[in-house]
Amino acid sequence: MKKINLAITGCMGRMGQQLIKSANKDKAFKITSLTESRRINKRIFGIRPEINSIDAFKKANVIIDFTVPKCTFEILKIAFKLKKKVVIGTTGFTKKEEKLIKKFSNKIPILKAGNMSLGVNLLMYLT
């Protein structure tokens, strides 16, 4: 089985850390890059986090974004140039920003969900 190469943004945040742990346990995934808004001088599972860039996302099949709206649009611009799939878990977008994400989704595959926490998903499943 071919692995899915992941780039995980916001790697120092709570969701970023959880994604890293989960992806490392699952043989279907390989983390090709981790990004953060500032330089980090430590390795996480052998990977040194980078700043969002074309080089950081080149090897990924999918970019997973759990950052802030400003960073999400940086990421979407790069993903568009590279024709990468994006999963957006970031929240707090304005209506104008939501429309812009919709425009990007006409060009590249985007999965956007405002809340991917276990508790919310369990609640949605039970109702």
Predicted regions and their residues:
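Extreme N-terminal starter segment of soluble prokaryotic enzymes
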Residues: 2-6
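N-terminal Rossmann NAD(P)H-binding glycine-rich loop of SDR-like oxidoreductase domains
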Residues: 8-20
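NAD(P)-binding Rossmann-fold cofactor-contacting core
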Residues: 22-46
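Short acidic low-complexity segments
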Residues: 30, 46-60
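N-terminal Rossmann-like NAD(P) cofactor-binding module of classical short-chain dehydrogenase/reductase
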Residues: 63-64
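Short glycine-/small-residue-rich Rossmann-like dinucleotide-binding loops
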Residues: 67-68
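Rossmann-fold NAD(P)-binding glycine/threonine-rich loop
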Residues: 76-77, 81-82, 89-113, 118-127
